[in-house]
Amino acid sequence: MPAATRIGDADVPHCSGMTRAAGSPNVFVNNIPWSRQGDNNTGHLIPPAPCPAHAAPIATGSTTVFVNGKGGGRIGDGVSGCTSVAAGSRNVFAGP
């Protein structure tokens, strides 16, 4: 099972690095808000040049674990038109 992702955890970088910027107001993983399907990452640059700035939400989350009615975000989940989640908790995991 993939690890749960949280605010501050990294996404796979492409033109510049980015981290999870949004999460649940009341569900926490290791005392950090759990980032869910639809929650954005920090603003970052996307190729090709001139690398326009944008932010993107988690496109897919868990289909069996829900956080405030949204799929819980996990390492490997896709980020809309962008990349994927790269980092998460070392000891909290969420199913498919």
Where are these regions (language model features)?
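Intrinsically disordered, low-complexity proline/glycine-rich segments
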Residues: 2-96
